Amino acid sequence: MIKILLLIDYSSEFDRKLLRGLVQYSKENGPWLFYRLPSYYSAMHGEQGILKWAKEWKADAIIGQWNNDTIDLQKELNIPVVLQNYHHRSVTYSNLTGDYKGTGRMAAQFFAKRMFRNFAYFGVKGVVWSDERCEGYRQEVKRIGGEFFSFESDKQEDEIRMEVSQWLQQLPKPVALFCCDDAHALFISETCRMNNIHIPEEIALLGVDNDELMCNISDPPISSIELEVERGGYSIGRLIHQQIKKEHGGTFNIVINPIRIEQIGRASCRERV
């Protein structure tokens, strides 16, 4: 039986969709056995602890996040490794990545069709998926002749709430605000409510991932860009299966593309008249 070690949390809708696709492939081509080591395991035991576990369990492949550049998993274990992008794309392992710039362009085009002239971005500083979503958004805003504003930080929400509040109040209105993901869009929604800034009349809000729980906690619910994550999970299963069977050599990139903007029943991006 093929054994897959998952260095993935289940807390985000992105991860759950990814795993649904992976599990679907395993059901069609298995049986496979999965074991999840959550993020706190690394905090408690370090990367060497993960490496020890993988060796003792005799894992056939690893999928997830790995931020230690000093340990070469493939050299140590000689098994397929697929990493989720965070700070940067790996040059050593296969990547689960995305068309991040394309996602940013889609957001700008969505707002441009609604006749916005002011465009803002809120995201995480220094992580590839947020940096490139910002860049794609900024490039498209420049192309269409809009005004661009951004706020990017690597600090925790509580550390920047006051600064973000001031930034939101100073933005020219109405403004189209694209956030790097739904969690950050929810933070913006909460901050707007605390400061009596009206969504969507003053700020139209758009997130990424279509995390239904995150989006619907907000009032009004948040519109969001849907990604083909389940398809990506299925593709990971197929490619690592080929590698395990020695049918595919070398590393590969699984690119998750944006597919649509989910607005049904959500009011954070009403049509402008």
Model-derived features: positions:
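Bacterial carbohydrate/catabolite-sensing allosteric modules
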Residues: 1-61, 70-272
